[in-house]
Amino acid sequence: MGIRSAIVKAVKKQMPPISATEKEALASGTVGWDGELMSGSPNWDKLFKYEKAELTAEEQAFLDGPVEKLCKIVDNWEIQKTNDLPPEAWKIIKEEGFMGLEIPKEYGGKGFSSKAHSAVVMKLASRSITAAVTVMVPNSLGPAELIGAYGTQAQKDYYLPRLANGTEIPCFALTGPDAGSDAGSIPDRGVVVKNEKGELGIRMNWEKRYITLGPIASLIGMAFKLEDPDNLLGKGVKDLGITVALVPRNTPGVEIGDRHAPMDLPFHNGPNKGKDVFVPIDAIIGGPEKAGKGWAMLMESLAVGRSLSLPALSTAAAKLSSYATGSYSRVRKQFGTSISNFEGIEEPLARMAGLTYLMNAAREATLQMVDAGERPAIPSAILKYHLTEGMRTIVNDAMDIHGGKAVSNGPQNVFSTLYKGIPIAITVEGANIMTRNLIIFGQGAVRAHPYTLKELDALDDPNPNKAFNKFAKVLAAHLGTGAVNAVKALVHGATGSRFAKAPKGVDKATKKYYKQINRLSAAFNLAANASLPLGGNLKKKERVSARMGDVYSNLYLASTALWYYEKNGAKKEEKVLVDWAVQHALAKAEKALDDALENHPLKATRLVKHIVFPRKLLTGALAVGTAVAAFVAAPVVAILGAVATVGAAIFIKDHQNKVPGDYLDRKVADTIRHPGEVRDNLTNGVFKPTDEKEPLGKLEMAFKLSVEVEPLEKKIYLATKEGTISKEQPRAKLIEAAVANNVITADEAAKVVEMDRLRRAVIMVDAFPQAAPAANDAPKATPAAPPKVA
C-alpha cells in the first residue's frame, strides 16, 4: 500500500494540475469528432453520420421575408451618423421575433434550429455588423439561453416570452477591468443576506465593461462570486463560487447607460456598475439550487454559442468579400485590362475563395453537431479562432484589391464596417491569442484525449490502492494504443501514406486526403502523448500548445471540408475548392507538427520527430546497414543497401502535403471572377441587393455585363491593331467608328456604352463638401517672401 500510494502521489505530480474552474470547463460540452482526431484512428462514420440538413420552410421564409426586409432598411452610413439602428429596424427586430430565434415556440419564440440561427446572423452581418451584433447577443450566451437551459419554471414562464418579443432587452455581464481572458477570477461579489424586511437575497457589488447591449438593456444577466458567510442557504459552504443572477436595470444601486465606442461601430456596448444592489434569492438563474454552479452553466452555453455567432459573422465577411471582390476585380481596369487577369490579384482571389469554402464547411458541419444535441466545446473554440482569423485574412485581401475604393469611407464603401469589425471578432468570446495558446490543445489534450481524463479520474480516487489499480489499467491501454499509433505514424511517414485507409463510398479523387488525415492523426496522438510528461508545465509552454492546437485545428478543418464536399453531392465543378481548402489545411497541420516537435522543450519528445518524419532515420539506418554489410564482406547486401539508401533519400518525403500551387490557385480564383453556379453556391446566404442605387447591386450589374462586353472590347481592340479604326480618338468616337466599320453592331455598341457607364459608377468614391469656416475663424496665411534675384 505504501509503495502504491507513493507511486500515485508521484504520478499526480507529473499530471497537469486542474483547478476547480478548469474541471468545470472540462466537464462541460461533449466530445465527438474532435475525440476521433485525437485518438489517432479516426472513425469516419462518426463524422459522416451527420447529414447536411436543410432549413425548414418556416425558417427559409423568415430569411426571405423579415431578414431580407431588415437588410434593406439598414444603411451602414446612416447608422454611423445617427449612432444607432433606425427606429424602423428596432421595430422589426422586436415585432418579428429576432430576439427569440431559438426560444421555444411555447414561450413565444421562433424555435429555430441552430443552422437557421446561424443563417440569420450571417445574412444580417453581410449587410450590417451593427444589426448582426444587435440580434446576435440576445440569442447567444445570456439570459435567454441560460434561463432556457437552467432556469426555474417561474423564470421561464415570466422572462422567456418577454425576451422573445423584445419587451425585455437583455445583456450579459461577465467581463470587468480585472477579469478579461481570465474570466474565472472575477472580483465581483455577492453576499447572501436578509434585508430589513427579512427577505432572503443577495447584496451585490460589481464593475463590468465591454457589455454589448448594456447601455439599453432592461435585464442584466450578472456573473459574480457568491458568498454565504452565515450559511443562510444551508449548504454549509461559505464561498459558493461563480453564480449567475438576473438583475433588472431599475434596481437601486445599478449604474448603467454609458457607452463605449468599439472601433466606432455603433452597436450598443458599455460599462455598468453596482453598489450594494439587493436582489431576491430567486433572482439566481435556476434558483438557490444553482448557487455556485454558474461557471459550469457558462461553459456549457459557450460551447454552443461559440459555434454560432462569430463563425456566422466571420463567414458572412468571407462570403461578401469573395462575392464583391471577384466581381470588382473583373470590372476594374488598369493598364488596359481587367485587374483580375494579373497574377498579383489572382493569388489573393484564390486565397479568399478557398478560405471561404473552408470556413463555411467547418461552420456547416459544426452546426449539424449542435443540432444533433452536442455541445462541441473544442470544435467551437477551433471555429472561434480560425474563422475569425480567416475573416481577418480575407477582408484584408479584399481591401488590398479594392485599394482606395475601400479606404474612402461613405455610402459607396461596403468594406469599412467589415474591416472595423475584425478586431472585435478577434477579441470577444475568448481572445484569439488565449484561444490558440491555451484552449484548443490545452483543453483538447485532456477532454478529447481517449485516456488522459480517465487517468486523472483514476488518480482522484481517495483510496490509493484503487487509484493505482484503475490508473494502471488505463495506462496499459494508453501505452498500447500509443505504440500502435507510433508504428502507424512511422509506416505512413515512410510510405507516403499509401497504405493508410480511406473511408468507403467517398469520391476517389479525394481518398488521398483521408489517408493523410489518418496519418497525421496518428502522428498527432503520438506527439500529444509525448507532450504529457510536461505535466503542469504544459500550461506554461504556450508555444507548444499553440502549435499542437494548429495541428488539431487544421485536421478538423480539413475533415469538415471533405464532409461538406461529400454532403454537397461531390460536385465536379466544386472539386478545385475542396482541393485548395484541404491542401491548405493539411500543409499547415504538417508544418505546425514539425515545428512543435522541432522546438519541443523535452529532448525525448524532439526525437519523436524522427518517427513522424522518418527520412533521416530510415536513410541513416540503411546507410549503417550498408556499411556493416560491406565490412563483413557481403557485397550483394551492401549494393542492395546502397540502392535502398539512395532510394529512401530520394523518395521518402517528410512533408507529404504542399500548399496549393499556382495552377490550382488560378482555377480557384476563376470560381469568383466568373459568374456561375459555383460562385453562387460559395457566396450563398449573404444579402445581395439588385437595385443599382445599392453599391453591391450596381457592382453585380457591371460584373455580369462585363462578361458580355469583353468579347466586344476585344473586337474593337483588334480593329485598332489592324488599322480598321484609329484608337487615337475619344472613347465615344471610337465606339461610333467601330459601328460604322461593322466591327460591332449598334446593339452591341449600346452594351459597351452602358458598361462604360456602370464601370465609372462602380469605381467612384464618395466626396463631401468642406464646411466653410466663419470669417473670423479662417486661417490666416502668410505669403512666402519672393526669392531674391542675384
Role assignments for model-derived ranges:
Residues 1-138, 145, 149-169, 181, ...:
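Amphipathic, small/basic residue-rich leader segments at the start of a protein or domain
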Residues 199-255:
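A short core secondary-structure module
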Residues 273-306, 323-340, 487-509, 520-539:
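A glycine-rich, basic-preceded beta-loop-alpha segment at the flavin cofactor/substrate interface
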